[in-house]
């Protein structure tokens, strides 16, 4: 089994809609086992720009993380599907040992 993690910003868009929503819908259409989306309260990336949620932030671009655990073949298919999407984020995979599913 593989873990796919995708880090992106809350403001990242695809066809005018939130990118994370597009990615979840695409994963669903491809029959992925499941996707979890996390919304961070604070973080920074390789550009070292701090993103955070507080009262004074009028328009925060908070970190969004998608996690998918699935068979390697499905992860690779999903990666090919999203390869042409341009966003400023991080995508990586890792081998995982699933102890329990379902």
Curated annotation (Swiss-Prot):
Q: Where are the transmembrane segments?
A: none
Q: Write down the InterPro entries for this protein, in alphabetical order.
A: N-reg_PII-like_a/b (IPR011322), N-reg_PII/ATP_PRibTrfase_C (IPR015867), UPF0166 (IPR003793)
Pfam families linked? DUF190 (PF02641)
Family to which this protein belongs: Belongs to the UPF0166 family.
Indicate what this protein is called per its UniProt record: UPF0166 protein TM_0021
């Amino acid at each position: 089994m593989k873990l796919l993690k995708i880090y992106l910003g809350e403001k990242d868009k695809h066809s005018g809609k939130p990118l994370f929503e597009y990615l979840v819908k695409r994963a669903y259409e491809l029959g992925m086992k499941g996707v979890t989306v996390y919304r961070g309260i604070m973080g920074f990336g390789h550009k070292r720009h701090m993103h955070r949620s507080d009262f004074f932030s009028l328009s925060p671009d908070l970190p969004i993380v998608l996690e998918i655990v699935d068979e390697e073949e499905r992860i690779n298919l999903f990666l090919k599907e999203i390869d042409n999407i341009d966003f400023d984020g991080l995508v990586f995979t890792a081998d995982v040992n699933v102890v329990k599913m379902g």
